[in-house]
Amino acid sequence: MGTSHNLTASKVLEEVRRIVGEVLGDRKASVYLFGSWARGEATRTSDIDLAIEAPAPLPPGTLARLRERLEESSVPYRVEVVDLKEADPAFRRHVLEEGLLWSD
């Protein structure tokens, strides 16, 4: 998988994880990678799909701040972030069944 910034797939995901960790801080939350990146089928035009599920509501602006940090980062892919608490039940089930749990 080639990238415009010469980052390997593992380095790209490592950078995304670092940013997610910085923005979420010590808040309890499960972070899932799902979609083509989780299946190992990503291409240079694939976006990175993340879902976040926190036991307590995230403070206002947290996801917006996360999206902004990811956009401004060196990650050469679009990163979609979904709050599972606000997701459709069928979509939530799909993510929980097929997504890769990054952190808890």
Feature roles, as predicted:
Residues 47:
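Conserved loop-to-beta-strand segment in the C-terminal subdomain of adenylate-forming
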Residues 1-32, 39-44, 54-104:
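Catalytic core of pol beta-like nucleotidyltransferases
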